[in-house]
């Protein structure tokens, strides 16, 4: 028990509940109309779930941005004592979501681009294209499985299934036969 005086805490709202309205001062500073309702809101993936229709038990989605997420809607609290997945209340009142998150999904590809793809960045600039287009073509030259090379994307530690802020990235199975395209494909896979 934390013994925190409830008077010190703000009220908790469900995502769609109106918590107030935009004040005249905030309207002047932001350009929003005074009186516009302000709601409890939602986290990025909880909001994405509503936007993509993942609002019933058993529905799910995945996203890859800086991090990678697998998100599933559930009507009941399902807490994994080992912490292999996260459980949160979601944007649908009375419901929950379970998700797995890896910190370094898209981040790993950007890191690889910035550290090892200077030539692709330079060529792409001269071609008025995105360097990722050239990186995709290079990765396509490596077979599925990147010639048995695995990449663990722990550039910023890890959240699930192994919560460990000290976890570090690894190329596993690296040998003298591997080429840059194999490393790139391993990162993508």
Enumerate the predicted regions with their spans:
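Active-site core segments that coordinate phosphate-bearing ligands/cofactors
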Residues: 1, 18-189
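Active-site-proximal cap/lid insertion segments
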Residues: 4
């Amino acid at each position: 028990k934390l013994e925190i005086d409830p008077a010190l805490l703000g009220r908790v709202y469900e995502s769609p509940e109106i918590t107030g309205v935009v004040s005249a001062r905030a309207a002047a500073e932001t350009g929003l109309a005074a009186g516009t309702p302000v709601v409890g809101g939602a986290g990025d993936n909880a909001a994405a779930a509503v936007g993509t229709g993942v609002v019933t038990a058993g529905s799910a989605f995945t996203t890859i941005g800086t991090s990678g997420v697998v998100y599933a809607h559930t009507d009941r609290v399902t807490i994994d004592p080992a912490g292999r997945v996260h459980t949160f209340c979601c944007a649908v009142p009375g419901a929950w979501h379970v998700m797995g998150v890896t910190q370094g999904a898209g981040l790993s590809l950007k890191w690889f681009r910035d550290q090892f793809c200077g030539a692709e960045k330079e060529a792409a600039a001269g071609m008025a294209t995105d360097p990722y287009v050239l990186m995709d073509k290079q990765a396509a030259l490596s077979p599925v499985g990147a010639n048995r090379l695995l990449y663990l994307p722990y550039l910023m530690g890890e959240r699930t299934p192994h919560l460990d802020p000290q976890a570090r990235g690894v190329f596993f199975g690296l040998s003298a036969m591997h080429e840059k395209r194999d490393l790139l494909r391993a990162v993508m896979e």
